[in-house]
């Protein structure tokens, strides 16, 4: 079990925090991650409440996609605009080995359904690990050729529990070189904002696009404007940092006012470091596993 149910933020607590961030912090986009958001019975209600908050322009979600298909229509009707589906293999046996479940077909059907009903943006997150799925790099590129999706290749990052090793990390430069040899027309798409996380590329005659998230070899800390509220209500100002502060406890135990919460958040942001540690230091830093942080 990732979290006890009593530890999770309630629907009302989530709504309160998003209202505060929108009003006081100028937040315009909210992404629901996890653990896995589709396991929450109140997910559609959460999306509906967030999408109605003044100032919120975009509600997105990151999911493993296994239980997504049947929920998509209601989520879209209630304000969900984009999804990221985490998918590290297109090979059935390998998918089962990596995820410990038989769900590849369900994930692929969820992606197709999202496209069919007109979800604005459909992204596929692929964490590339040497010796595990790096041989599927071009298969995922082909996926972007055949479908109007953005396939995002993510450099393998050090987190608790993933047995990270430098040699397992396939760099952006290496991935790009492999793809460019097969598709020489690959060309950079200009960033829409300074806070863009991925380096985005288009290829001639492709329905979709490909991107690279280069957290390890070419960090984007200087343009990062993201804050994370974890499922249990802890605030993280940096994905790779291990400093957290509990907004849930501030609300439940300390009966914090909105001004109190604002002060807590501002204090955490002021303590944020200019950039995250290097790969080797991160590998030995105590931090949550990625599944507990959310993608």
Question: What residue spans do the PLM features occupy?
Answer:
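Short, small-residue-biased leader/transition segments that mark boundaries at the very start
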Residues: 1-2
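Radical SAM/AdoMet-radical enzyme domain recognition
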Residues: 8-11, 15-31, 40-154
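Conserved G/P- and acidic residue-centered "switch" motifs that form tight phosphate/ATP-binding loops
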Residues: 36
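Auxiliary Fe-S-binding modules of radical SAM enzymes
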Residues: 145-146, 156-159, 163-295
